[in-house]
A protein has these predicted regions:
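Acidic (Asp/Glu-rich), glycine- and aromatic
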Residues: 31, 40, 127, 136-183
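Beta-strand-rich recognition/accessory modules
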Residues: 2-24, 31, 205-297
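Extended, loop-rich substrate-binding clefts of extracytoplasmic carbohydrate-active enzymes
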Residues: 7, 70-137, 151-155
Length: 430
């Protein structure tokens, strides 16, 4: 599908399917895999940047190996570090993803596509993408899904996944979020990227402890992104001397990407949900507060999948899980939680519904949250507390005391100090 057409020739209305409500209008681009290339409040400017195939609001997934280059396929040298990376719009050579199916109803757009590997020339991903966009007031509620069909059946380690990748036009340059230790209390916000601080590129890694962040203009109006499953994110602005102006076809752009850490099995169907919120930053924040009332970051079930848990130096039985995480562990290997925020003194124990025999010993490694460094990047430090649990070979609930955690933390690991086998059906943080 390689063509010499310019990027912006695919941004015309005849390539988009639109839905709107009383407040906002969105356009999914069916020439670019259904990526979102138009989002605006009624009567206002389009917020979304589309200067190349790697922008838009779109899905992008990552897995080893890196580099990833099938035999006979050209790879862009500057992108070889990325590895396996299908994205929704198309590749860096201007080959577009192929839409398989789409439909547009009063309040929902659905698109299914075969994505393209970003670093490779005309190499479709060994998967399909599906996306559902639904309008609710000033929100776009989105479900994004990947269906893997990868011939390489290796269970590779987890990698960070953009959930999703969001690119705004240059007018919406200011990166704002709450990054403190008292989330959902209307505590003071942090301006991460401004005209004055010179930050934005490279992208900043940070922890939005209220599960939202936003890119806004000089009047604090713009686009927010909420996701309930992670407190890790990137934010930034490219072409830092052009903050505050620019349209969909200009190089300068704001960027937000909440980050999950996921294992992508060769056959997995994996989805995530997020919301795009249009408005003033205070409105974005209060909307995120309402959305977060339905979030659960304390109870994890492994009935069908890993529920955002992953490993260091462990391979389990794959996807679907068949009811539990079933794996052998060795000295130094780790079971790792998703990067979610836990307040100081908020949690007393980890409850494991599990089957194992004998004693398991190790350390709970808390990733203590220390806020931001001088460049507004995330600061974490590890703090370990020993644990020991005993099993009879029968399924039972056992508890690991975590009351000794000295401060807030963002996720934890169970690091094993011996070898054995365990089946874990659920993890509850109480």
């Amino acid at each position: 599908m390689s063509e010499e057409k310019s990027f912006d020739s695919y941004l015309t209305d005849d390539n988009l399917i639109f839905i709107e409500n009383e407040y906002i209008r969105i356009g999914a681009n069916i020439s670019l895999g259904g990526a979102l290339t138009y989002l605006a409040e009624k009567g206002k400017k389009n917020l979304i940047n589309s200067s190349d195939w790697g922008r838009q609001v779109q899905m992008s997934f990552y897995a080893p190996p890196a580099p990833y280059q099938p035999e006979g396929v050209e790879m862009a040298e500057c992108w070889k570090f990325i590895g396996w990376n299908p994205i929704q719009s198309g590749d860096c050579y201007r080959n577009r993803s192929r839409v398989l199916e789409y439909r547009c109803e009063d309040n929902e757009i659905y698109v299914k596509c075969i994505p393209m590997h970003w670093p490779l020339n005309n190499c479709p991903g060994e998967c399909t993408f599906e996306v559902w966009y639904r309008l609710d007031g000033y929100c776009v509620n989105v479900t994004s899904k990947i269906n893997m069909d990868r011939p390489d059946k290796t269970q590779y380690p987890a990698r960070h996944q953009e959930q999703p990748a969001v690119y705004t036009n240059g007018e919406w340059y200011k990166g704002v979020a709450y990054t403190g230790k008292k989330p959902f209390t209307n505590d003071s916000l942090t301006e991460l990227v401004t005209k004055e601080n010179g930050l934005g590129w490279p992208w900043l890694n940070f922890a939005p402890t209220e599960n939202w962040s936003a890119l806004v203009d000089d009047n604090n109006y713009g686009l927010g992104v909420y996701i309930g499953s992670t407190n890790l994110s990137k934010i930034g602005f490219a072409v830092t001397d052009k903050k505050g102006w620019g349209g969909p076809k200009d190089d300068q752009t704001g960027y937000i990407a909440p980050l999950g850490c996921e294992i992508l099995d060769h056959n997995i169907s994996y989805s995530y949900d997020y919301s795009l919120i249009v408005g003033q930053v205070d409105f974005i924040r209060q909307t995120a507060y309402e959305l977060d009332k339905n979030a659960d970051r304390r109870h994890f079930s492994f009935e069908r999948d890993r529920d955002h848990f992953y490993y260091k130096d462990i391979t389990d039985k794959g996807y679907p899980t068949g009811g539990c995480l079933d794996f052998d562990f060795g000295i130094g290997s780790e079971l790792k939680s998703p990067p979610v925020f836990f307040g100081k003194g908020e949690c007393k124990q980890i409850e494991l519904d599990a089957t194992f025999e004998g004693e398991i010993s190790g350390d709970v490694i808390f990733h203590l949250y220390e806020g931001l460094d001088e460049k507004n990047n995330l600061k974490l430090s590890d703090y370990g507390v020993p644990f020991s649990i005993k099993g009879t070979g029968e399924r039972a609930t056992c508890s690991v005391d975590i009351s000794a955690a000295p401060d807030c933390f963002i996720g934890f690991s169970l690091r094993f100090n011996n070898s054995g086998h365990i089946s874990i059906y659920s993890v509850n943080i109480e």
